[in-house]
Structure formats: structure tokens, C-alpha cells
């Protein structure tokens, strides 16, 4: 083995030697690889972070990345020219306030062991930021004492804990949360301390507050900090009563005062400030004091002495009374006054000084005052000039003497009646003041006691859909207006009077009245037309009269506007849709006046006026249009809403509101029902189906266009030609009952139209009989035993009742239970079910009847009869009053004694104990008038228009009625007594009127035909179910 290895080694050496000997020795690789390095994030925040280092190399190499501490970050073998990436490298967080850095370098070593090095890559880590301070230090600087109590409060007035009147030493430091605080110094014995609170703002950091204490009885030393007065200079001379501006350098909360006057708050900016103070009206030196707060909140003051001199007095100044000045109101017009004054320039003042050359305009009597030295003679004149603006001595001497007096108080007063020189109205005159015969002053005045030119009021419409105007409607002289109306004057050039040539000798060539100011419109109601002052020929007096009685007043109009044809226009509102104020009332005739006004309040009323009447209410449809007038089978409970069969159309009427303009000429009133135009007269409602209908009418207006404001009384109607339905739930058809027993009866009624009105239950022993005779021994008529009305118009009704079964002695057979239902439209239905009633064993005899009678009110009864008789037994038959409550009360009086019967039925061959039966019930009844019942029955079976209607199955309806309506006239229950006894007397009062009709209530004044009963009947029954009856006819 060893030999072979040695041989192989020798062979290799020989081979190499052989190659070298051929002259082809290879060149050695000495070129280092090129490598670069980069980092994905060179700047990291202070917290822990990470970076990714990557780079490129141009040949196959081993790449090693290290940090500046020599620690290897990663080693990567790159097979060929390409890129490399190190895994993410964690960077430790920086806890210092300065930033730190870490540098990285990559080396690449190729196969020939050549090494290339990249440039250095640095990663910076930011330092930790210092947190914003939240506290500040307040230093207490005590001047004059070594310690003192203090109180510290925050901005909300809350005491800082531990510092409520707590003693601290000089230069004490107190750490508190940043903010605004107030420091109050406490008392120190023997020392005078600060008397004000100190505001300290610690929001921006530490502050010091200085608290100055001085020994009692010593002068307070000059505080730290100062304020300097810049102007006025020391010793400046100013006039007493004048205003002086004081300027100073920077301070806070500065106030200025002069002597002992009230302080004035100064205006302060960032570098300086000022305040304006009024110096006293006296002579001598005064002190101006300026005080404020320094930068640390301490009080700082400065003073300045100035000299005050007496202002020169100008005597002879004429001043009008302040309470007579004619000022402007909130509407921009001069206030009302009979006398007064106002300063006006009238074009002679200048823009540079608008108060120059102002005249005092006066009207009425004006009070003046003039200042003059005491003890001097004061003469007052009213002068006119003769060509120059200032009166000459001759003008003065020729003037009117207003007053001549020796001045005592220094101020003299006088009055001037501006109407004394009427021919000089609008011309400048002069109040001349002459003092001691030598000093002369002048005050020009202009009297103006006349109003402007008369306006002429006119009316026109406003451009909106609602407004309308009818001038001189139907030659009535009235203008009718709907909605707002525009009031104006056609004269845009109204001038004040007197305007024109001045009298000879005046200082003005032209008169100069105060000038036109405004127009206002006044509406005087018809209730004031007889006011005599409205006929005043003086237009100014007439203006006062108009204002005293007008009820609608427009706002003043100061400008004529842009449309010359409608100058000085103003809108007067009316009606609910108008939002314009003021508003006129409907159906009131007004006179429209215009009043013009000048600059001193003189007013002129228009010589003419317009008559206007406002109407914003449309016509009214009166009464009902259609009404049910068919009483068959029964009247409608709501004849103006619920219609059946025949209705009567009256079409109502239409009228404009009282005082309105009237109906639009040529318009007629038409109505429609179900799309059909309807005419006055009878109307068969069977032409229409049964739903609800709205009565339509054409678009009517009055002459101004106001639409109808009310619909017909019955704007909606319900056509109901369908009979109600009814069926029995109990008793069971063909059920068998013993007489005297209780039969439970229940019927259900419904109506899909106007609703159920009432249900009545009857028992009957005859069926299919229509002769209306009363048979014996059975009654043979339907006899009512229960009734129920529905008052709320319900669509369904259920009636539960009990009936004590009745049967003749030894009788057995069918009894017919009948339910009669009437709906609110007057339609009716009868339903019948039959049961079998057998006489009870003890039902062997009928109750015995006592005497009975029907007699007039306050008459005596004549009891007659003791059997089943129906006749006028004693000739006292009553005649009913069918137009209202009857004056004849029918009193039914009877005395019935039940029989003591013996039970003859012996089913077991033995004699049983006799059973005594008692009277159970005595009932009073009125028989439905036979003639009227025959009409109803014939109507239901033959003549009802509904039987020919296209909206019902006429054949089925006829068959149904044919089966149910073939019955005799029913007996209507009037009252009963239900106490079991061996005998019973029963009295009952009746008004004779059939309650199928009488007592029906309607929401209108229409009456319903009333019908009386044609018989009064009584039925007496016992506990065994046997019965007797009696009756008395009623005279027709």
C-alpha cells in the first residue's frame, strides 16, 4: 500500500516537471472580487428595530458581513456573479438621548484567495426624546418680610392643596402643574401687604411673583417694574372741559384718571397704549394718573401734572330746546310733533364739513335759550334781510322784538312762534342777539309750517296667481280686491311747499322749505266714513283726521322707485295666502288715502281717495243636494247619507259670502253623482251600484276668482239598495218545547252598506196569511218579544233573547219565530224559523181577563170586556196626532186573574195533586197600522224598484221576499210587567206613535212621516204558557 502511494506521488512530481519543461507555466489569479453592501433602512427610531443587509459580487466568492465590533452578521456562498442577502439583523433599542450608530462591511474571497472589501454601511438609531415638562416652579419673592401667608388658586378658583393661607418663607419654591394661577398675599402683623390678587401664568414654565410688604406707617417703596407716560408733556396747558389723549408705554390692564374723576379703561397694543380723558372745567394744575400691571402682575403707576386754563366763553349763542328736536324714528322718518326743530343743510353745506352752513328749520312754537353775561342787557330780534345774508342794523331795527331783558342767571330763554311771518314760510330769517347794545350774534332759522304737495292714491294688482282686482266693478264705484294690492301715486315729482319765488326783500331768491320726505298710505274703514273731520278742506287738518281713524297703515315710502307710473308704491295684504303686512279685513269697504310728509313732519292728505273692498272668501254651497225620500219599506236613518231606492235631488244653492263681490256672471251650478250629471227632482238610486259616492260640482268661483269654500252638506253619500241579511242560530228548527218553558233565541244580522239599524224578534202562530184579521182563540199576528238598536253604524249585530213559550190549552203545533232587521238606509229583511210548542199538562185553561180601557189623558177609565175582543168597546177610541208628540196619552189599564186549574191528565191511573199556575206576564202592544203594513208588504213583494235593478238577482230577491213577507201586521211591544202573581193590574202610557218611525234622530231639520198604531192590544200569559189577549181599536 505504502509503495503504491509513494509511486503515485512520484509520478505526479514527474508530470509537473515535465510540463514545466515545455515552457507553458499558467499565470497566477491575483484580482480581488468586487463587492458592494447596502441596507434597507439606515435610520431607525429609538426603539428595538431590525435591518436587512444585501449586496452584489462579480464572481464566485464567499461573502462575509461583519459589524464594526467584528461580529459576523452572515456568511453567504455566491456560486457566480450575482446578489446576496443576509437574514434580518436585530438592532438593539437606544435608551440615551443622543443617537447611536452601527457600521457594517462585507468581504468577498474568491477561489484564488483574493479578498475584496465593500464600502462601509452605517445604521443610525435615534436618541430618546425628552418628554414635555408637565410641571413648573413658582417662586414666591417676599419684599419687606421674611415670611408671609399665601393662598394659591387654579384657573377654576379651586385652592391648590396645601396652600390655603399657608405661611411660606422668602424665595420659597412651589412645584405645581402647568397652568394659570392666582396668588393672594395674607396679612403680616405690623406690615401693609398687597391688596390685589396676582395672576401668574405658568403654562410656559417657571415664574416668580413678588409680594411687597411695608411697615405700617411708612411709604410703599416703588415696585419693581414701571409704566411711563409719553404724552402730554409735564405742564402742558389745556382748556377746561376738553378731551386729552394720554399715551404710555407697554403695560397690562391699564386705566387712566384725572384728579378724582372715574377711571377710563385704556386701549393697549403690543408696545404702547392710550386713553382719552376729559379734564375738569376749572383752572389750575391737575394730575393725570396711569396705573396698570407689570410683567409679573405687580401694580405699576405713573403720574403727570398738566395745567388747565378757562375756556373762552362766547356769549350770544342761541340754542334750541333739546326736547323739541325732530329726531328720526326706526322707520327713517322724522317723529310726529306739532312743534319742533331740525338742522338741515339744504345744499349749502360742504362735503369737507357737512355741519357747516346748516339752517335750523322750525315749525310751530320752538323754545330757545341764549347765554349772556350776568347783569348785561340782552335784546332778541327776529329780522329779515334786504339782500345780504346777515341782517344790517336797519334790518335788525325793523325786526320783531322777541325779548328784551337784563340777564340775571347767564342764560335767558324765549319762544318763537314760527307762524308769525307766514308770507316768509320757507325763507331764511335771523334770530339776532344784541348784548349790552354792542355785541351782536346771529342764528339763521327757516320756518316751515306747510306740508308737501298732495299725492293722488291709485290701485293696481300684484303679479301673483292669487291676486286680482276689479276696478269700479259693475259701476259701483268700488274696487274689489283679492289678495294683496299695490297702492301708489302717479306723481313721482312731489315737492315740499312753499317752493318758488321768495318775497321781495328776503335773503334767498328762492324759498327753501324743509323738503319732501315720504308717503304713507292709510285705509279708513266704512265705520268712520261719517267722521266730519274727513271733509276738512285744510289738507293738513284732514291728514290728522285720516290718521286718527285709519285701521290699516302702510310703512312709509321714502323713494319713488324705478317705475314712474307707480311711484312710491306699497303693497297692502289681504287673505290667508298673503304674507304681506299690514293686512286689510275682508268684507270691509275702505277709503284709501295717501299722506305726504316733509323733512320736519308736516303732512298733507290727498284730496281724493279710492274706495276698495277686499274679498278673499269664495261662494258657499248651501243645503244638501240629495236626500232619501223613500219611506218604504222604512225611512233612512241617515237620509242625507244613506240612500235607498228613490231619492230627491234639490241641488242645494250657491251664494257668495255676505258682503262679497258676488258670483261670477255666467257660471251655473251643476252636480254629478257617479259620473252622471244630476238634475232636480226624483232620482232612482238603483241606477247606480252600491258603493260610496262623492257629489261632484263644477269649478265655481266668485267674480274675483275665489273658489267655493264649502262642499254640499252631504258631500258624500252611500247608495245602499241591498237588503240586510239575518239568520237564526237558535232555536233549533222544528225543536219541540213545552208551553211555559224558556226558549233561547239568537239571531245574527249583517249589512254591508250603511250598517244595521235594529233587529226585532217576534213569535207568530199564522204563516202565509196576509188578511190582517185577528183570529180566535189564537192571536195570529207576529208578537214582538225582543228588540235591539245599533247606534254606531256597525255592519253586524247579534241579538240574544229568551221567550216564554206560549200555547193554547190542549194545543200543540208550530210557532214561528221571526226576525225583522232594518238597516240604516231603510232596507228590511224578515227571516223565519219554526218550532213546535206543546201545551203543558197543567195548561188547561186560559187566564181570565179583567176590565181594560184606552182613554184620553185626564179622563176616567171605563173598564169593559172580559174576553178576547178587539173593538172600540166603550166608544172612547183616541185620535192620534201624527205631527209630533201626541196630546193623547193612551193608558192601558187591566185586571187579569189567573185561573186555578186542575190537572186532568192521569198517566199512571192515580189522582195527582192539583197544580196552581200564576199570571207571569202582562204586555202592552201597538198594532202596526194595517194600511201602512200593506204598503210595505206590497212594496217588498211587487213595487220596489230594486226588483228591477240590474245590480241584483231580481228573481232570487223576489222569491226570498215572497217566502218571508207574507205575514199579518205585527204587534209592536210597548211595555210589559213580568212579576208572577195570581192576579196583576198593569198600567201603560203611550204616545200612540209607531216607534218604527217616531223617535228616529237625524242630523238635520227634515221631518219624517209619522204613523200611529191602529190598535192597542194586551196579552196576559200564565206560568203554564196559556194566554189571553184583548184590544181596542184606534180611530183614524
Swiss-Prot record:
Biological processes annotated in GO = cell wall organization
Q: Does the keyword Manganese apply?
A: no
| Keyword set, alphabetical order | Cell wall, Cell wall biogenesis/degradation, Disulfide bond, Glycoprotein, Lipoprotein, S-layer, Secreted, Signal
> Where does it sit, as one GO cellular component term?
S-layer
According to its UniProt record, where is this protein located? Secreted, Cell wall, S-layer
InterPro entries noted in UniProt: Ig-like_fold (IPR013783)
Gene3D superfamilies cross-referenced by the UniProt entry: Immunoglobulins
Q: How is it modified after translation?
A: Glycosylated; contains six glycans.
Q: Where is the signal peptide?
A: 1-17
Which cysteines are cross-linked by disulfides? Answer: 74-86, 256-275, 642-754
Anything further noted? The hydrophilic C-terminal region rich in aromatic amino acids could be engaged in interactions with nucleic acids, and the bound fatty acids and the N-terminal region could serve to anchor the layer to the outer membrane of D.radiodurans. The HPI layer contains about 30% beta structure and virtually no alpha helix.
**Its biological function?**
Shape maintenance, possible protection from noxious enzymes or exogenous and unsettling DNA, and may mediate homotypic cell-cell contacts.
What is this protein called in UniProt? Hexagonally packed intermediate-layer surface protein
Gene source species: Deinococcus radiodurans
Gene name for this UniProt entry: hpi
